[in-house]
Swiss-Prot record:
EC number: 2.7.7.7
Lineage, highest ranks first: Bacteria, Bacillati, Actinomycetota, Actinomycetes, Mycobacteriales
Keyword Nucleotidyltransferase listed: yes
Enzyme superclass (EC): transferase
Lyase is among the record's keywords: no
Pfam families in the record: DNA_pol3_alpha, DNA_pol3_finger, HHH_6, PHP, tRNA_anti-codon
Protein name (database record): DNA polymerase III subunit alpha
Organism: Mycobacterium leprae (strain TN)
Gene3D superfamilies per record: 1.10.150.870, Bacterial DNA polymerase III alpha subunit, thumb domain (1.10.10.1600), Metal-dependent hydrolases (3.20.20.140)
Length: 1177
């Protein structure tokens, strides 16, 4: 090692989040340029970057020295009090963060020391967390000191803090304590020089302690960025952290620009004369540090599955698969099943994975045993018969042509990957079960790192430079960026780099940068921020399991808000060392299915078992063929619904195909339309080559001669080239990677195989030219089949139990009012009336009531789950509410709240009590005040104290409610305010058909993605939530929500348009708008350029349509069918239903949502359903 060199040991990478600005790859490039033999990493309180740092170091050929700048509690780590050592006048010199911590620098000398650092950083989070700091203490470090080198740390260290406070004796005692804990050879006196007074004031005191205790000096540089010119990026990053601007004189900042990787010459110039040996100590430590390779050595850390005596894991797997086949096939498995299961088990055991299958099966079977709904299978695992027998999947792979080799085969070297879908609301229970089963120290969720991406970097940069006005500037810049592709924006460097593939698309934003100096400043700073880690999060589904305590292998942290244990490394780093990663996915549609089944049981008394539902239900395929699949899993979007209408599915294989085809690749080659046209005889099925027509007939028959699935490519290679399915899977992967040299090699073997089977060169080339591009987008049929089954189940529920399914669907969308509006409109189309919330009838969520749906109280603004729970408990215990007075008398103090009561009034939840909404609104505040005092007294037992112990009656209040009522228009506006949409009626009822005649695009069509960016459209509806604003130049503009009967969309009226139409942009105005569609990220909106207020003043309401029905015909199914007929003919005519029972006739006025347009088609539909006499007098 060059003795004139230097090793930087105290460095903060970007994993010191929003404090360190040193990215690891550039850091090693600079260390290499400086010809330094090693470099350290000491991030603040965590070891999140250790894996990336180590692997980057090994690639660069530079020795990694991994450590941590630890937070040390001033007392016990368990003590959450802030402890200071000086008097109040010394606050600036005292323990950091008002008494929270001091610092200590620690690095691992070897693999054992590194594992001890993992334990220390983990336990600091588990036991020493105070606010955002994970703190250790002397006791903990003493327990895990082996293999660790410690220094006195930065100026915030314990020894330096004591010296600044004038506590010289305590400083000496502190240094002696740490020296004793870690050993005299492992303790160093850390010295820094950034020209700061806090460094200079204690230097002589430190050196004196070093001389007295024989502690060698160590020079460090507290690096926070890689090179000197990155100081501005670091200043900007600190402003992102603190929310300050660069112009703020009081912002947190580092003084000077010396916190970078200085050269050896720079460091030795600082220290060699003043403190000889301080730089040499860095080389000494670097030489002492041994390889950490053992920490990253891959090893089998899969949990050992417990099996009965007399079995090993392989034999128990065979036993469980055999038992599973008997459960699946009580009359005995069909021919070939036992043989295939045996083959699969042989492969699983030969690859060493029997425990993995047993673990997954245990998880799935536990979920089912406690009523947690599990998906039927996802990914290639659905191709495994063993998985089907074990209950891991619920789709039999053999009749669907699914291949085990696509999932696992003798040639595969990596772990199989079985992902599991659970009911979204109960995923957390499964994580807890895994921890209970395998040990809480051996199971953890997985960390993710949120980085500062392109748009965020621009917005952060604009704010820190220009404050509040910067938001508008950033908006202008981000709107000029080219559209994101697959949710990824162009990197900022690509905007000005002609070599970047999207350079030409960035001309607009590049022009801004070149012509506007403010934009150029924002851009330059943003480039320094882009890509830096902003925060740590938790992966949505990944869970790590281990056979040993996880802290033996990786660092962990405890999420403060909920105590969840999280890995300190992302899942690829965990998998690389042999830890088992599983995905526990929360699937919302399983929650919807579960709610729908519960609704069916409650509403109809039917216990529905979806697994037993036949896959040939006619009503389901009729629904699919109509494209009535809003809310159906994977089939919800507008273009998908159009494809279903073209395709007219008639069997489950069509559903599987549509999921595989509706993706950019196949659609780009028009394969989706080709499939639909060939299925419906609109296109001739052509063979790939005459020689191949017969050999490939069976393989391609199900997809009408098209290659749709990866499994088909594998079967083709097996059939015509003599490949094994394992080798065919290797071919499939090679084709997907598109590497020329690999493809040439594969084509050679493929061609030889086909020639050996008698195929001509022309046939070989024709087939290769077809399967090569198809391999790039051909879909995994196993995954499509598993998800296709969920699609079928949800379609089946909607087709056969529409009310119950839609209630579950509406509950699932929660606060997404745009989705709720679309689904409510779909309910009307299906003849389902959505009833408003009701204090006497509603529960928390949407609920099916006969053929209708009742709004849940939990969907009312300002009404939380606790209030609803209290209200329902009261209703169950004391009976339904007779009137508003009875309601106030019965409810407990939880529900007795003016804001809650007002919200329920506006939402119409008291309508059934016979009061007007306005009347209740006028008296509710005084009424609540009147009863509140009594209820508070009841709650603390005062009535008992003053003579109420004999069980006397409660105090009773009577409130007189005025009869005054708001106009319908105002009632509906308030209803929308509370519910986010109109429920009991709609301001457009009676004129919607007139409005629809003047538009060219429906709002749901835009929201479904059926209209591309920048398209001009004409839409109509009613304005709501009008928000008038002023831009940075003081010019007014507005935004609003435009609602029609089917949905709502945001419309922006920018200054030019606003200046012409501002007077008409008011709440509740019915308008027609010409606008441009704007698609940005996941947000779709309209930019208006013209507005028209149509005149409907002379519209005459059509004469009511009278429909007669015998009371004995009033069955659930008949009424539901009638609603569907009426919903198919929307219009302005009221419908009167005449119920005939003998001589008695009862006339009901149907809901406004069921108004119709009288037409011969409607009359024919009614007569077909109810008989020819239904329209007579």
């Amino acid at each position: 090692m060059n003795q004139s060199s230097f090793v930087h040991l105290h460095n903060h990478t970007e994993y010191s989040m929003l404090d360190g600005a040193a990215k690891i790859t550039p850091m090693f490039a600079e260390v290499e340029r400086l010809q330094m033999p090693a470099v350290g990493m000491t991030d603040h309180g965590n070891m999140f970057g250790a894996s990336e740092f180590y692997n980057t170091a090994i690639k660069a050929g530079i020795k990694p020295i991994i450590g941590v700048e630890a937070y040390i509690a001033p007392g016990s780590r368990f003590d959450t009090r802030r402890i200071t050592w000086g008097d109040p006048s010394q606050k600036a010199d005292d323990v950091s963060a008002g008494g929270a911590y001091t610092h200590l620098t620690m690095v691992a000398e070897n693999a054992a020391g590194l594992r001890n650092l993992f334990k220390l950083s983990s336990l600091a989070s588990f036991e020493g967390q105070l606010s955002k700091w994970s703190r250790m203490d002397a006791e903990l470090i003493g327990e895990y000191a082996e293999g660790i080198i410690v220094t006195t740390g930065c100026p915030s260290g314990e020894v330096q803090t004591r010296l600044r406070l004038g506590h010289d004796r305590e400083a000496l005692e502190s240094a002696a304590k740490w020296r004793e804990i870690v050993g005299p050879d492992n303790y160093f006196l850390e010295l820094m020089d950034h020209g700061l007074s806090i460094e200079q004031r204690v230097r002589e005191g430190l050196l004196n302690i070093g001389r007295k205790l024989n502690i060698p000096p160590l020079a460090t540089n507290d690096c926070h960025y890689v090179t000197r010119d990155a100081v501005h990026n670091h200043e900007a990053l600190l402003c992102v952290q603190t929310g300050k601007t660069l112009s703020d004189p009081n912002r947190f900042k580092f003084h000077g620009d010396g916190y970078y990787l200085k050269s050896a010459a720079e460091m030795r110039q600082l220290w060699d004369d003043e403190v000889p040996g301080a730089c040499d100590s860095t080389l000494l430590i670097a030489e002492r540090v041994q390889s950490y390779a053992d920490v990253w050595e891959p090893r089998n850390r899969m949990p050992v599955f417990p099996v009965p005596v007399g079995h090993d894991q392989a034999s128990w797997l065979r036993h469980e698969v055999d038992a599973g086949l008997k459960r699946r096939f009580p009359d005995g498995p069909p021919n070939g099943y036992v043989e295939r299961a045996a083959y699969e088990i042989d492969v699983i055991c030969d690859k060493g994975f029997p425990a993995y299958f047993l673990i997954v099966a245990d998880l799935v079977n536990h979920a089912r045993s406690v009523g947690i709904r599990v998906g039927p299978g996802r990914g290639s695992a659905a191709g495994s018969l063993a998985a089907y027998a074990l209950g891991i999947t619920d789709i039999d792979p053999i009749p669907h042509g699914l291949l085990f080799e696509r999932f696992l085969n003798p040639e595969r070297t990596s772990m199989p990957d079985i992902d599991i879908d659970f009911d979204d609301r109960r995923r957390g229970e499964m994580v807890r079960y895994a921890a209970d089963k395998w040990g809480h120290d051996r199971v953890a969720q997985v960390i993710t790192f949120g980085t500062i991406k392109t748009k965020a970097a621009l917005k952060d940069s604009a704010r820190i430079h220009y404050g509040q006005p910067g938001f508008a500037m950033a908006d202008r810049i981000t709107k000029a960026l080219p559209p994101a592709i697959m949710a990824k924006d162009i990197p900022l460097s690509g905007i000005t780099d002609p070599a970047h593939e999207r350079f030409k698309e960035a001309a607009e934003v590049r022009s801004l940068i070149e012509t506007d100096s403010d934009v150029r400043i924002i851009y330059q700073t943003a480039r320094g921020l882009e890509g830096l880690i902003r925060n740590a999060g938790v992966h949505a589904c990944a869970v790590i399991l281990s056979s040993e305590p996880l802290t033996e292998a990786i660092p962990l942290w405890k999420r403060p808000q909920d105590g969840a244990i999280i890995t300190g490394w992302d899942y690829p780093a965990c998998e690389a060392i042999g830890l088992l990663k599983m995905d526990f996915l929360g699937l919302r549609n399983l929650t919807i299915i579960g709610d729908a089944i519960e609704n069916i049981k409650t509403n109809r008394g039917i216990d529905l078992d979806l697994e037993s539902v036949p896959l040939d239900d006619q009503a389901t395929y009729e629904l699919l063929g109509r494209g009535d699949t809003l809310g159906v899993f994977q089939l919800d979007g507008g273009p998908m619904r159009d494809l279903l209408r073209r395709m007219q599915p008639t069997g489950f294989e069509d559903i599987v195909a549509v999921l595989a085809l509706y993706r950019p690749g196949p659609m780009g080659m028009n394969a989706h339309n080709d499939y639909a046209d060939r299925k419906n005889n609109r296109q001739v099925i052509k063979p790939i080559h005459p020689e191949l027509e017969e050999p490939l007939r069976e393989i391609l028959a199900e997809t009408y001669g098209l290659i749709v699935y990866q499994e088909q490519i594998m079967r083709i290679a097996q059939k015509v080239a003599g490949y094994s399915l394992a080798r065919a899977d290797i071919l499939r992967k090679a084709m997907g990677k598109k590497k020329r040299e690999v493809l040439e090699k594969e084509f050679e073997g493929f061609s030889e195989g086909m020639q050996a089977n008698g195929f001509s060169v022309h046939a070989i080339k024709a087939l290769w030219d077809i399967i090569l591009p198809f391999a790039d987008y051909a879909f995994n049929k196993s995954h499509a089949a598993g998800y296709g089954l969920i699609s079928y189940w949800t379609a089946y529920l909607k087709a056969n139990f529409a009310g119950e399914y839609m209630a579950g669907l509406l509950t699932s969308v929660g606060d997404d009012k745009d989705k709720a509006a679309v689904y409510l409109a779909d309910c009307r189309k299906f003849g389902i009336t959505v009833l408003p919330p009701d204090v006497n009838e509603s529960v928390l969520d949407f609920a099916s009531v006969g053929a209708d749906i009742r709004y849940g109280l939990g969907a009312v603004r300002n009404v939380g789950a606790n209030v609803v729970g209290s209200l329902i408990k009261t209703r169950n215990a004391k009976g339904k509410f007779a009137d508003f007075s009875d309601y106030l008398n019965k409810i407990d103090i939880t529900s007795c709240n003016k804001k809650v009561t007002e919200s329920l009034i506006k939402a119409g939840a008291f309508d059934s009590l016979g009061h007007s909404r306005k009347g209740l609104f006028l008296v509710h505040a005084d009424a609540v005040d009147s009863v509140l005092g009594t209820k508070k007294a009841e709650a603390i037992g005062q009535f008992d104290l003053f003579g109420g112990t004999d069980g006397g009656t409660d105090a009773v209040f009577t409130i007189k409610v005025p009869d005054d009522e708001w106009e319908d228009k105002h009632k509906l506006a308030l209803e929308r305010e509370m519910l986010g949409l109109y429920v009991s009626g709609h301001p457009l009822n009676g004129v919607a058909h007139l409005l629809a005649a003047q538009v060219d695009t429906a709002i749901p069509t835009i929201l479904d993605g059926g209209v591309s960016n920048d398209t001009q459209v004409r839409v109509g509806g009613i304005l709501a939530a009008v928000n008038r604003r002023v831009n940075k130049n003081g010019i007014p503009w507005a935004s609003a929500q435009l609602d029609d009967l089917t949905g709502g969309i945001e419309v922006m009226f920018f200054p030019h348009t606003y200046s012409s139409y501002g007077a008409d942009i008011i709440d509740d105005a019915v308008v027609l708008v010409n606008a441009k569609v704007v698609v940005r990220d996941d947000r779709i909106a309209l930019i208006a350029n013209q507005l028209v207020v149509p005149d409907f003043s002379n519209v005459q309401e059509d004469r009511p349509l009278a429909v007669s029905l015998l009371t004995r015909q009033c069955t659930f199914d008949k009424v539901n069918a009638l609603k569907q007929v009426l919903a198919r003919h929307p219009g302005t005519s009221q419908v009167h239903l005449r119920l005939i029972s003998g001589d008695r006739i009862t006339t009901l006025e149907l809901d406004q949502s069921l108004r119709v347009t009288s037409s011969p088609a409607l009359m024919g539909d009614l007569k077909a359903l109810l008989g020819p006499g239904c329209l007579g007098d």
